[in-house]
């Protein structure tokens, strides 16, 4: 019942239930449908992981091929830069960039690629290219006068790509988890809905304390499914491209 102090006045009331399950994925403490954030966050998470994996892998592949082919001071310089970069704390640097510079997803993506280029992959690819460099077809290409660029990009790099595909596929979810980790720490892009941002808002809104477990479980489940799916695909591709596992 309602009481008014003016004759002929009317009251319009609407019942609002905060945090109750409504729609496909439920709502948060501000009555926003979580399915919208989860659906919008899916292509963003996958695109972040894909671009980071592509940028890192291709750059490492080219740098390793150039380092192996030319050798000398170029190879020594790249190895020293790699050794120094591997000592640097990766996550704290990203936290500093997000805290003091910018939390834009494009800035974070560029920083992740730049910090990941001179990593352990450089040394792994270099060891593979050392074997390819001594192959007979490389000697044949050198004997008929092929240029350095042609040998690197036409004969060396394509030779290694099939062996890198399984590892490349498995690398994508690691960058998806990295972006989500930064968002959970409050360093995600405030203008873009991501899975990590949903978990961060669930923590800030007291989801577990208020019994809204779905608010945390749904994005966590999507992250788990993403990692599992790429792991299965990477394992299957490894059995296809790895000659040692092909007959098993």
Where would I find each of the regions flagged by the language model?
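Alpha-helical transmembrane segments of integral membrane proteins
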Residues: 27-248
